[in-house]
């Protein structure tokens, strides 16, 4: 699986066991992702942070 880094022009290949890509936003500003990468389990959203997870190459 390949996931985009913070700047979508760059991406990385995920290590074994991390088979989801994620994108993290601040709830107050959903237009600009704060973090992107590989993850094993999609975190729950909180009052401050929203996560979007997916499982295809460069889907984040």
From Swiss-Prot:
GO CC annotation terms, alphabetical: extracellular region; membrane; other organism cell membrane
Major location category of this protein: secreted
Disulfide feature: 3-21, 14-38, 42-53, 54-59
Keywords annotated in UniProt: Cardiotoxin, Cytolysis, Disulfide bond, Membrane, Secreted, Target cell membrane, Target membrane, Toxin
InterPro entries for this protein: Cytotoxin_Cobra (IPR003572), Snake_3FTx (IPR003571), Snake_toxin-like_sf (IPR045860), Snake_toxin_con_site (IPR018354), Toxin_cobra-type (IPR054131)
Gene3D superfamilies per UniProt: CD59
Entry's Gene Ontology BP terms: killing of cells of another organism
GO terms assigned for molecular function: toxin activity
Pfam family, one: Toxin_cobra-type
Quaternary structure (record): Monomer in solution; Homodimer and oligomer in the presence of negatively charged lipids forming a pore with a size ranging between 20 and 30 Angstroms.
Its job: Shows cytolytic activity on many different cells by forming pore in lipid membranes. In vivo, increases heart rate or kills the animal by cardiac arrest. In addition, it binds to heparin with high affinity, interacts with Kv channel-interacting protein 1 (KCNIP1) in a calcium-independent manner, and binds to integrin alpha-V/beta-3 (ITGAV/ITGB3) with moderate affinity. Has hemolytic activity towards human erythrocytes (EC(50)=0.074 uM) and cytolytic activity towards various cell lines.
Similarity field: Belongs to the three-finger toxin family. Short-chain subfamily. Type IA cytotoxin sub-subfamily.
Identification of the protein by name: Cytotoxin 8
Highest classification ranks of the organism: Eukaryota, Metazoa, Chordata, Craniata, Vertebrata
């Amino acid at each position: 699986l390949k996931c985009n880094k913070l700047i979508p022009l760059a991406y990385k290949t995920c290590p074994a066991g991390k088979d989801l890509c994620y994108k993290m936003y601040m709830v107050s500003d959903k237009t600009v992702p704060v973090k992107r990468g590989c993850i094993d389990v999609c975190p729950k959203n909180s009052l401050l942070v929203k996560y979007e997870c997916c499982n295809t190459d460069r889907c984040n």
